[in-house]
Amino acid sequence: MQLDLHAPLSAAGLLSIIVSVGTIVSSLLTPKLLRLFGTGKLVFISVALTAVASVGYGFSATFWMMCLFAIPMGIGAGAIDVSLNNFAAIHLESKHTSWLHASWGIGACLGPALFALSAFLGFGWRGAYELVALLLGVIAVMMLASLPIWKRREHLDGPQQSPASAPDISLRAALRVPGMKLSFWTFFFYSSLEISTSLWCGTYLVARGFEPEVGALAVSLMFASVMVGRILSGFFAIRFTDMRLVHAGIAIVVVGCMVLVLPLPLWVTPVCICLLGLGCAPVYPSLIHATPARFGEELSGRAISIQMAGSYLGSIIMPPAFGFVAGHFSVIVWPVALAIFVGSLLFCVCLLDYVTRKKLNNAFAAERIMDVLQQVKAMEEQRKRARRERRRLRRKQKRQKLLKSRGR
């Protein structure tokens, strides 16, 4: 791919940044799009966008052409994430949300396999993207055929739970709700933990004395652990609450980080990486599913969009930040970085629970949140009136100055 496009190796980072920025912007705009299209139509449009972007990747003759198609890829990915997570959090049980997120692990394992198969058959990286586009096209057709089912399910639980009936809540107003900023930072540190684990665990093993093949295998084992952990956590979700699963997952990650720094036999290190994957598994889907109970269904779409933005921002910033630190010190400090991420995550989760219980009182969250939003709306209207009044006074002063100058 690099040789085909005559691009430097660092260009892959630029492509990733374009997709990630597009995903962040798209996730923040998704609540408005959900009111306009509904969940089913928006997911169909988003999948179709990613399919078009994959076709564009496969046929790109230059790197800058790939950058152009990275924009719809990011927009589609962000809208899919927010809309599906919001639908699952409101309409499905916790176990279904865990199993939905387990499919991410399947895709993470399947993607490299498709590229390897395409290379083996002689189609190269372009053939792999065309195959991905074909699969996404099939999913888009299935989504189009299932649109009536989406509408029926949304209205089955009550018209007030339909995205079209959700109130128009601005980003500024939502951030005034107690716990919303903490929710952003919770997902920021979770993604920092998960992405840093997947990106740097192989390099860490090689630095500890393992063969590069073992390091590559550890990355695959980490993704497999997340997938298996989410499948298993779906069954545990039948019996335990979302927050118990979150706390259990963080506890497993803490144990994994502690064992990493102990002077144990070398073979224990890959086992610890699997432990990190298992610990990460229930945290993300359980936090997502707890969102409507924490902030109310009216604010769920906006809250999840903020959480997704925090997640993507963490995945953009923290891995290269650790790379900078590792370049100045050593990759051996990787467990210390993980400890900082998991400590920050635990602090945010505990503080988020405290704030939402104290200030919102989960049983009355929806009513309290709507009161907060009404207060914010009143303050915004007051600021708008004040700005209009200031503009009117400035225009009046300009007219008076103009009249005085003419009088002279």
Regions found by a protein language model. Name each.
Residues 25-64:
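Conserved MFS/SLC helix-loop-helix module at the cytosolic interface between two early adjacent transmembrane helices
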Residues 178-227, 231:
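Extracytoplasmic gate region of multi-pass secondary transporters
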Residues 69-104:
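Cytoplasmic helix-loop-helix junction between adjacent transmembrane helices
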Residues 240-287:
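C-terminal transmembrane helical hairpin of 12-TM major facilitator-type secondary transporters
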Residues 297-331:
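A late C-terminal transmembrane helix in Major Facilitator Superfamily
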Residues 100-151:
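Helix-loop-helix hairpin linking two adjacent transmembrane segments in secondary transporters
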Residues 26-38, 229-241, 326:
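Helix-to-loop junctions at the C-terminal end of transmembrane segments
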Residues 6, 38, 59-64, 241, ...:
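Helix-breaking motifs and short loop linkers at transmembrane-helix boundaries and internal kinks
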